[in-house]
A protein has these predicted regions:
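C-terminal structural segment of proteins
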Residues: 1-179
Length: 179
């Protein structure tokens, strides 16, 4: 069975695998992605997750909620077997900002994404003052695009900036056979 199920094989990375919806970044033994639409939005908006169990409550930043296979290959989140996610808190950090979400999928909004992106932008007079940009379905956790955020901050919000941001966002991608 696959690594995520406690086995010793990655069927998605085999040469004959149809691996169109798998990691473009940070692939290792496991090339599964976080196929969630809300995940990149929650990370971009700096949400926090309230988790309860019989021992009490803890709060985890959305960015730290999703777990890399290098930490524990059998889990995708920090939730333990007796944990319950009770609340998602979205601070007002990005209140008044422009928010953008885009998803590319084969069969429409109900399908797993090939990629999705969430962005919060604080714009004044056509210039980007601050940015929080996160891609989903490209690696095992939502991928914060810190270099892209730095690039667009201080630039005009226009097609040229978008082209530069897109080129930087895919730099370092290591596609598998079909993605």
């Amino acid at each position: 069975s696959c690594y995520r199920a406690g086995g010793n094989t990655c069927y998605a990375s085999a040469p004959e695998a149809v691996n169109r919806e798998h990691c473009l970044f940070e692939g290792n033994r496991c090339v599964a992605v976080t196929p969630s639409d809300p995940a990149p939005a929650l990370v971009a908006l700096e949400a926090s997750m309230v988790i309860r169990n019989s021992r009490g409550e803890r709060v985890v930043a959305a960015e730290d909620f999703f777990m890399k296979p290098s930490v524990d290959i059998t889990r995708m989140t920090v939730l333990e077997p007796d944990d319950l996610l009770t609340t998602i808190r979205i601070p007002n950090t990005w209140a008044g900002a422009d928010f953008y979400f885009e998803k590319a999928a084969d069969r429409g909004s109900w399908d797993f994404p090939m990629v999705n992106v969430a962005a919060a932008l604080r714009v004044e007079g056509g210039r980007i003052l601050a940015a929080s940009i996160v891609a989903g379905a490209v690696q095992c956790t939502p991928r914060r695009l810190g270099e892209v955020e730095a690039l667009v901050t201080g630039r005009d919000r226009n097609d040229e900036t978008a082209e530069l941001a897109g080129a930087l966002a895919i730099r370092g991608a290591e596609p598998l056979n079909y993605n």
